[in-house]
Amino acid sequence: MAGMRRNPLAARRTGRPQNASVSGGASFSDFSELFGMGAPVASGQVVTPESAMRFSAVFACVRLLGGAVASAPVKVYLREGTEQRQLAHGHPLADVLRLRPNRFMTSTTFWKTFVAHKVLQGNGYAHIIRERSGEPVGLYPLNPRNVVVYWAWELGLDQRLGVERNRLFYRVTFEDGQARLYDQDDMLHVPNVGFDGKRGLSTISAAGQGIGLGLAAEESSARFFSN
């Protein structure tokens, strides 16, 4: 993995709001992404991340990519100066990334889940859990449907808190309906290619017609051979 600064993933202390409960409006496109709603494509299929995984080609690709990332060796480096780096033997972050990101998942399960979110829905999100010192001690994957990304200026945080206008904040809605706002330093976010600098483009949205056609063809073939 890429080299990291002296304090890997350390939280910034200046001008950063603590994780706080929030409320606010969202566009229809936000809710559409939030709940995974899929519009019917020309084949008549409704393509969502769940329905796309019923298409054998999609399932095979997601499984292959997730397995490759999950089996890749993980090393943590500390950056020395501007051009040198040093392998961080025994750094606690290495165990988080390599062995157990959280108490509910092995690293294999975590990375397969993270990659599936990224390739299907366009974004992989994981909340970074920290000790009081700011050191990262855990990673929890978040369903992209439950995450909305904002620039600081969109929420008025640049005026209220004095943070950079283009700093990212993540509104996460949990199963109990509560929503919390997280600073970009408390979120691991790997997006697909995108257009706004905040979120990656959903593969399902971009390739919906092709996936829908594949689903329809498989269903048609299955009905033919069942008769």
What positions do the PLM features span?
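Structured, contiguous alpha/beta core segments that scaffold functional sites
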Residues: 2-227
